Swiss-Prot record:
Any Gene Ontology CC annotation: actin filament
Keyword terms, alphabetized: Acetylation, Actin-binding, Calcium, Coiled coil, Cytoplasm, Cytoskeleton, Disease variant, Metal-binding, Muscle protein, Phosphoprotein
Organism: Homo sapiens (Human)
GO biological process: actin filament organization; muscle contraction; osteoblast differentiation; platelet formation
Name of the featured protein: Tropomyosin alpha-4 chain
SUPFAM superfamilies, sorted: Tropomyosin (SSF57997)
UniProt cross-references to Gene3D superfamilies, sorted A to Z: 1.20.5.170, 1.20.5.370
Keyword Phosphoprotein appears in the UniProt entry: yes
């Protein structure tokens, strides 16, 4: 009778151990599923981080291109400013030439007045100064020719001054155009910089999330190892109990 009771006790112990082993196995499977899920989430987070890094790289490349366009625009603006300075210096040279021509014309007018005065004197003294009158008439003719040449030169100078003024206006318009482009490029660079900062912030958040997921996975792996050790212990106890039962 005592042997039967002992056998029943052993069977109950075996059943209890078997139940514990099944429960441990279920827990191990649940932990494994949870671990797999965490690994999938970690892989997804790593994919998000890689995508963000690619976006950051694209934004940086676009920013570099915008900076290159801005540098080109600034260089063209500088060249336009130099051309405007050269045109201004050319205008000053033309103004100086015009002033000199005006001075020459004033001198010629004075000479003309003097020639007329001499001609009047010659009329009164025709017989006496006939030879001088011929000379003065020749000088008057040459003076008139010089006056005509000066008038033609003044016309040419006025046309040249008009062309320089038009060129200067064109340069000013080009300078305003480049200034507008520069403002546009600066605004584009600011938008790209804001996007880059936003992408970097999202990348940092994703990296922190990955770190948390990795810690969770490590904890789950540790729990899984403990559960496996418990399962091995239960199996050893079960084997020992079966051996004892066989000995009986």
């Amino acid at each position: 009778m005592a042997g039967l009771n002992s056998l029943e006790a052993v069977k109950r112990k075996i059943q209890a151990l078997q139940q514990q082993a099944d429960e441990a196995e279920d827990r191990a499977q649940g932990l494994q599923r949870e671990l797999d899920g965490e690994r999938e989430r970690r892989e997804k987070a790593e994919g998000d981080v890689a995508a963000l890094n690619r976006r950051i790289q694209l934004v940086e490349e676009e920013l570099d291109r915008a900076q290159e366009r801005l540098a080109t625009a600034l260089q063209k603006l500088e060249e336009a400013e130099k051309a405007a300075d050269e045109s201004e210096r050319g205008m000053k040279v033309i103004e100086n030439r015009a002033m000199k021509d005006e001075e020459k014309m004033e001198i010629q007018e004075m000479q003309l007045k003097e020639a007329k005065h001499i001609a009047e004197e010659a009329d009164r003294k025709y017989e006496e100064v006939a030879r001088k009158l011929v000379i003065l008439e020749g000088e008057l003719e040459r003076a008139e020719e010089r006056a005509e040449v000066s008038e033609l030169k003044c016309g040419d100078l006025e046309e040249e001054l008009k062309n320089v003024t038009n060129n200067l206006k064109s340069l000013e318009a080009a300078s305003e155009k480049y200034s507008e482009k520069e403002d546009k490029y600066e605004e584009e660079i600011k938008l790209l910089s804001d996007k880059l900062k936003e992408a970097e912030t999202r990348a940092e958040f994703a990296e922190r999330t990955v770190a948390k997921l990795e810690k969770t996975i490590d904890d789950l792996e540790e729990k899984l190892a403990q559960a496996k050790e418990e399962n091995v212990g239960l199996h050893q106890t079960l084997d020992q109990t079966l051996n004892e039962l066989n000995c009986i």
